[in-house]
């Protein structure tokens, strides 16, 4: 279910503060965050945010087409290692 239009998009306070500081100083540096539920807002465009996937932080460069999506959508948590091998020889 989507978020109500009456509410504002969720952005974690510490993440929003870091982005606003960098925008005021006009600096670009990697922002490390565990907040996968935060929504990407227009002030984040042009920044690189390292999003935690459960094991490591994946650096993601934010572009205008990502606005409105959640940060967690761009850092997959599972890696597909392939289906189980069909080994008929071992069954005999």
Swiss-Prot record:
The keyword Ribonucleoprotein applies. The keyword rRNA-binding applies. One of its GO terms (molecular function) is structural constituent of ribosome. It is found in: Plastid, Chloroplast. Pfam families: Ribosomal_S19 (PF00203). One of its GO terms (cellular component) is mitochondrial small ribosomal subunit. Keywords: Chloroplast, Plastid, Ribonucleoprotein, Ribosomal protein, RNA-binding, rRNA-binding. GO terms for biological process: ribosomal small subunit assembly; translation. It comes from the Eukaryota. InterPro entries: Ribosomal_uS19, Ribosomal_uS19_bac-type, Ribosomal_uS19_CS, Ribosomal_uS19_SF. SUPFAM superfamilies: Ribosomal protein S19. HAMAP family: Ribosomal_uS19 (MF_00531). Protein S19 forms a complex with S13 that binds strongly to the 16S ribosomal RNA. PANTHER family: RIBOSOMAL PROTEIN S19P FAMILY MEMBER, SMALL RIBOSOMAL SUBUNIT PROTEIN US19M. Belongs to the universal ribosomal protein uS19 family. This is Small ribosomal subunit protein uS19c. It comes from Drimys granadensis.
């Amino acid at each position: 279910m989507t978020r109500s239009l009456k509410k504002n998009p969720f952005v974690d306070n510490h993440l929003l503060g870091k982005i606003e500081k960098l925008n005021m100083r006009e600096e670009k540096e990697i922002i490390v965050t565990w907040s996968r539920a935060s929504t990407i807002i227009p002030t984040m465009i042009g920044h690189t945010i390292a999003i935690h996937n459960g094991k490591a932080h994946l650096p993601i460069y934010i572009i205008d087409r990502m606005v409105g999506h959640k940060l967690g959508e761009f850092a997959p948590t599972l890696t597909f290692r392939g289906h189980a091998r069909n080994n008929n020889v071992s069954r005999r």
